[in-house]
Amino acid sequence: MELTILILLLPFFSFLLLGIGGKWMSHRTAGAIGTLVLGAVTVLSYVTAFQYFSAPRLEDGTFTTLIPYNFTWLPFTETLHFDLGILLDPISVMMLIVISTVSLMVHIYSFGYMKGEIGFQRYYAFLSLFTMSMLGLVVATNIFQMYLFWELVGVSSYLLIGFYYTKPAAISASKKAFIVTRFADLGFLIGILIYGYYGGTFGFTPVSYTHLTLPTIR
């Protein structure tokens, strides 16, 4: 499962390539790059799923949780830090298959549906960013990474909804979607900070439940 990092890196590099150099590419070239990259991501997702579900299980018959990649981004204390990595469990592995497969179908369909549209290359760049954001969300090793990629999902959704930026209706819809979700995201962020403060970590399991004490409500 050493290649799982490519599941995130490939669409990210596709986003950079199409976003920066897309204007010098033909529609066919840009669409082919985006689609082939997602094809590779889909294959890697299925390979990862096969390897994961073929691996030995725990004594109680459950699947183990694997973290093939994880590094500390911003350290605060010994246990409290922002990490970026990849966590594999049955849910995240199945979601890799769902996201990559659906995204590949969207890329293939868009190749003909968006044919001749102005900004075709930009559209495929946004699709790559959207896919990378969703993939990063489901394999997050901690709640802060989940929040980070959730915000990227919101940004890429805003860009895709407002793709036809010359149409007032598209601009209005993109702004509405972006602003409304930001209110909920603020609550999400506050909850994460409270969790980190009282739990001593941004991981999905507090360092010690015995030390997880909440203030008394009077």
Give names to the regions the model predicted.
Residues 1-212, 218:
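...captures the hydrophobic TM-helix bundle architecture rather than a specific catalytic motif
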